[in-house]
Amino acid sequence: MTSSNLPYAADAESPLKPAELQVLRAQYEKEGDYVGVQTKFNYAWGLIKSNFRADQQEGVRLLSEIFRAHPERRRECLFYLALGNYKLGNYGEARRYNDLLIDKEPGNLQAASLRTLIDDRVSREGMVGIAIVGGLALAAGVVGGLLFRGQRR
């Protein structure tokens, strides 16, 4: 199943325009050492939606800070922590945060669609891993056979 079949997971593939992210960055930087939780959340959200890995990592870091320091904002952070980790390829972490959200909100369609994306990606990468291991085993067998054959002569 692709993300086009999962309208609620559209956030996974739709970055902000650079100018939109710059507005969030400017507000975050303007507030400096006294940045508000909402400003920090907004900036982290924009970073996670980015196509750039460094931005996504920074977004996850900022949301993790909010998650730890502001228990009243944890529910809001869960989806975007799951999404950020998904985009970074940290599927175990993505699943953990997403499952926490689903436990709190079993009817959350956004979290349900993200669960499907995570499961699909894990399956796909698992198959690629199996193919790589199989290819390596085949290559080792061929090399071993050639070496064995060479020793018999």
From Swiss-Prot:
GO terms for cellular component: mitochondrial outer membrane; peroxisomal membrane. It holds the Pfam family Fis1_TPR_C. Keywords: Membrane, Mitochondrion, Mitochondrion outer membrane, Repeat, TPR repeat, Transmembrane, Transmembrane helix. SUPFAM superfamilies: TPR-like (SSF48452). The chain crosses the membrane at residues 128-148. One of its GO terms (biological process) is peroxisome fission. Residues 149-153 are mitochondrial intermembrane. Disulfide bonds: none annotated. The keyword Membrane applies. TPR repeats lie at residues 75-108. Its main location: mitochondrion. It comes from the Eukaryota. The C-terminus is required for mitochondrial localization, while the N-terminus is necessary for mitochondrial fission. PANTHER family: MITOCHONDRIAL FISSION 1 PROTEIN, TETRATRICOPEPTIDE REPEAT PROTEIN 11 TPR REPEAT PROTEIN 11. Has a role in mitochondrial fission. Has a role in outer membrane fission but not matrix separation. This is Mitochondrial fission 1 protein. It comes from Emericella nidulans (strain FGSC A4 / ATCC 38163 / CBS 112.46 / NRRL 194 / M139). The gene is fis1.
